Amino acid sequence: MPDFLSKNRVSELAALKQKKQRRAQGLCVLEGLRLITQLAADGILPKEVYLLDGEEALPALASVPAFICDQRALDRICDTEHPQGIAALYELPRSDFKGFRRAFYLDGISDPGNLGTIFRLSMAFGIDAVLLSEDCADPASPKVIRSSLGAVYKVPYAQMNPIALKLPGLKVVGTSAEGDTALHAFQPPARAPMLIVIGSEAHGVTPEVAKRCETMLRIEMAPGMESLNAAVAAGIVAHHLWVESLTS
């Protein structure tokens, strides 16, 4: 039978809610049966598992040390208001960024839910990497990992200064409601690496980044709509490019 989680250990795990502590230790606590099951299916196993008394351990995690805790302890170590009956301790996702053929550059995407969703749809639609401005949400935070359903562990990412957007041979395209090129008419380059810039819904692509874009793509919408959620816009663009790659 698993041991009970000690009070001292609960305090140590609760400290990982702070970004500084996560970075210092290279660890984070993730919760939820769906996320932990998906990570296990992807071959990503935790260092420890924490279960409410009466909950059964996952067969896929049979080799992982397990501990029993009460609801109060689970509430302390998890960053959600109503955590489910299972949590686990993971190493932070580490990017093995080497290059890309097609990538997103995220310009000020500060909402963790949007950022996680963009990682997830990047896996679905063949986006090789996600590059981030300095003011984006932390890709290694539990909220981002949870909303990505673990995709942050699979899609390479890196922080990137806008100055690097003008690398030789790199095609950079932005997105804007007032863009000069309709998305459906855009032909992606056959061989050159391409970077697709997604700005925040509130502010769009910043002027510093926009001036480095060769063209601005426009997602055509019904009258009366001014903008889309950043993750929704990213999904529409990524899906269009994915379909184009299948038919070209």
Predicted regions and their residues:
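Alpha-helix capping/helix-boundary segments
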Residues: 34-36, 55-56, 73-74, 136-137, ...
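Structured adenosyl-cofactor binding patch, chiefly the S-adenosyl-L-methionine
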Residues: 88, 121-125, 136-153, 207-248
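Glycine/small-residue-rich loop that forms an oxyanion/phosphate-binding "nest" at active or ligand-binding sites
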Residues: 64-91
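Amphipathic alpha-helical repeat scaffolds
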Residues: 32, 110-118, 226-232
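Short acidic-hydrophobic, aromatic-tinged amphipathic segments that line or gate anion-handling sites
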Residues: 2-4, 67-70, 155-163
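Active-site/ligand-binding-proximal alpha/beta "capping" segment
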Residues: 174-225
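Boundary-proximal intrinsically disordered activation/regulatory segments immediately upstream
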Residues: 1-54, 136-137
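RNA substrate-binding interface of SAM-dependent RNA methyltransferases
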Residues: 41, 89-180
